[in-house]
């Protein structure tokens, strides 16, 4: 089993790099160079290729092998990072990212989305039923670790680590990962998948997906359960930067510290569900408790933000406000990790109610909605903050975080 899990761990770690780069590192660097919250937030629109995974997933499934697609996409990611290394970084006073840089970041997300489909397909084919538990743990932990290394980890070394050196380092990492994907013995033993003789017609696919019991409720829940958390999580570090926190400190706490807490939360959620997995209601019961705690944590974070605007409030080293703000970042990530693990378990349970031939597509459909629910608030948070001000913006995030708590009362009986 170690011969399978070790290469998967390395590949999932590499898969988390683009997310950490664009969710943690770039926003703080761009804000430090004077870009508005609106423009910083809108750069997350570059995640758009991730929402189109269902468009090329059939191609990855039917043409070639997952190993070929995985190697090809990883090599392309290294090439894009190499091109980014030769371009000048965003300069202070610019109104936004240069068009060429935006285009390459869009290609980076396209390659990462193709890599995601290929790697998930490979994991499904590679792992035996008894290996799914350890395999899923490796997936979550390695992905979040890669995100932390590319986000907070690299940010800690700025400005020592220059823009060209950053992307040259990522280029070397991607090409090493591509060599790993091609040379790993366990991955080389996979055979070419057989193409199914029956392919659902596109016009009926959505109808078939929505006909699965519990899908409408699950789709609505996964679309909304992260909106408040994601909006606040993307905006709060930038506001701390505006109030005097250093970029390196935020990289350490918002990146590495928060990612460590998120991994711990995901691990705790998995352990709790594994201990009580015999009853399908357990994920919903866990969600009900943790979502209420998350709502309380966001209320405290909002109160901290309001207090920072009062005379005499400071984020200087050694102050209570500084410790409370950094603790708030980590606490929300920890609770968010538990919530994510429980929610993905609910998604899997719902997809298992679908016909076997539709289960993979059904799960991809729910995962795409889950991603959309995280991207929208992260992208629009800056626009809301610039237009409404941080106070009203965080009040809206509180309302959005309360909706999933109420939504759980409407869960259908086939999921409870």
From Swiss-Prot:
A GO cellular-component term linked to this record: membrane
Which superkingdom, per the lineage?
Answer: Eukaryota
Record localization? Membrane
The cross-references to Pfam families, in alphabetical order and at most eight, read:
MFS_1
Q: Which GO terms describe its molecular function?
A: transmembrane transporter activity
Q: Which Gene3D superfamilies match?
A: MFS general substrate transporter like domains (1.20.1250.20)
User: What keywords appear on the UniProt entry?
Assistant: Membrane, Transmembrane, Transmembrane helix, Transport
- Keyword Cell inner membrane in the entry? The reply is no
* Transmembrane regions listed in the UniProt entry: 10-30, 40-60, 68-88, 99-119, 139-158, 170-190, 204-224, 252-272, 295-315, 324-344, 365-385, 392-412
Entry membrane topology: Multi-pass membrane protein
PANTHER family in the cross-refs: MAJOR FACILITATOR SUPERFAMILY DOMAIN-CONTAINING PROTEIN 3, SOLUTE CARRIER FAMILY 33 ACETYL-COA TRANSPORTER -RELATED
- Which family is annotated? Belongs to the major facilitator superfamily.
Name used for this protein in its record: Major facilitator superfamily domain-containing protein 3
Q: Which organism is it from?
A: Rattus norvegicus
- Organism lineage string: Eukaryota, Metazoa, Chordata, Craniata, Vertebrata
């Amino acid at each position: 089993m170690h011969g399978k899990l070790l290469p998967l761990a390395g590949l999932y770690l590499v898969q988390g790099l683009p997310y950490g780069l664009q969710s943690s590192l770039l926003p703080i660097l761009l804000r430090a160079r004077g870009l508005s919250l609106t423009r910083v937030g809108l750069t997350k629109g570059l995640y758009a290729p991730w929402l189109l995974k269902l468009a090329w997933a059939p191609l990855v499934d039917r043409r070639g092998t997952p190993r070929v697609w995985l190697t090809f996409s990883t090599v392309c990611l290294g090439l894009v990072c190499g091109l980014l290394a030769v371009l000048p970084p965003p300069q202070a006073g610019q109104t936004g990212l240069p068009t060429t840089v935006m285009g390459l970041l869009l290609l980076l997300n396209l390659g990462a989305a193709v890599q995601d489909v290929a790697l998930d397909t490979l994991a499904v084919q590679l792992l035996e039923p008894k290996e799914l538990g350890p395999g899923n743990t490796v997936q979550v932990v390695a992905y979040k670790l890669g995100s932390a290394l590319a986000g907070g980890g690299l940010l800690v070394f700025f400005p020592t680590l220059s823009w060209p050196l950053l992307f040259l380092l990522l280029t070397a990492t991607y090409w090493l990962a591509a060599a790993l994907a091609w040379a790993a013995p366990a991955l080389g033993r996979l055979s070419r998948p057989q193409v199914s003789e029956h392919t659902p017609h596109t016009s009926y696919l959505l109808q078939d997906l929505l006909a699965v019991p519990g899908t409408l409720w699950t789709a609505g829940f996964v679309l909304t359960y992260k909106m408040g958390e994601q909006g606040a999580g993307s905006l709060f570090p930038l506001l701390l930067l505006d109030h005097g926190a250093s970029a390196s400190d935020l990289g350490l706490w918002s990146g590495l510290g928060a990612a460590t807490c998120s991994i711990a939360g995901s691990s705790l959620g998995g352990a709790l569900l594994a201990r009580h997995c015999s009853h399908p209601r357990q994920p919903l019961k866990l969600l009900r408790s943790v979502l209420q705690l998350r709502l309380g944590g966001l209320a405290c974070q909002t109160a901290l933000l309001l207090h920072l605007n009062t005379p005499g409030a400071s984020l200087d080293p050694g102050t209570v406000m500084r410790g409370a703000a950094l603790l708030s970042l980590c606490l929300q990530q920890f609770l968010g990790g538990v919530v994510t693990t429980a929610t993905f378990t609910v998604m899997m349970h719902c997809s298992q109610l679908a016909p076997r031939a539709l289960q993979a597509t059904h799960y991809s459909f729910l995962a795409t909605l889950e991603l959309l629910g995280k991207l929208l608030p992260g992208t629009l948070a800056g626009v809301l903050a610039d237009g409404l001000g941080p106070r009203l913006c965080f009040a809206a995030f509180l309302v959005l975080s309360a909706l999933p708590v109420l939504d759980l009362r409407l869960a259908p009986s086939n999921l409870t």
